[in-house]
Amino acid sequence: MKTIAITELTEIEAIIRKCPYCTVGITDLEGNPYVVPMNFAYRDGVIYLHSGPEGSKVTMAERHTRVCITFCEGHELVYMHRQVACSYSMKSRSVMCHGNVRFIEDMDEKRNVLDVIMQQYTSDEFKYSEPAVRNVKVWEVKIDKMTCRSFGLRPSEVTSE
């Protein structure tokens, strides 16, 4: 099975938009990896996340702002030879993004980002109460490194390397 790099930004963004959630990798307070699924929105090279105003992941991200965010879609079990276990693979496409977390504090900016996040999941319009906006932590991660791969391709599916 082959793995190929995907470099076309429009294709990478299409993969991101197909994902219902992302996984965020943070460094915990002891220096260990901590990975958590989160709802998100993506716009113009920026990933937006939201969470409660406090808790483990917020404390970690305040201490260690560097994060890795991954997206994966299109899971399909594939094989080259049905009776050969090592020929099996999971066909999928994944995007890996790196950046630093900035917590948005401005109330109007928070509302705008919450709209962007909600647009990821629904076309409905929303209003946000002052207490609700005050009680949410809005994360902004400007992507400074992004890679994308397609895994589990049969040689006949690879058009170029």
Locate the predicted segments by residue.
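Extreme N-terminal tail/first-helix region
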Residues: 1-18, 159
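Helix-adjacent hinge/juxtasegments
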Residues: 57-81, 86-88
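Short beta-strand segments
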Residues: 19-53, 69
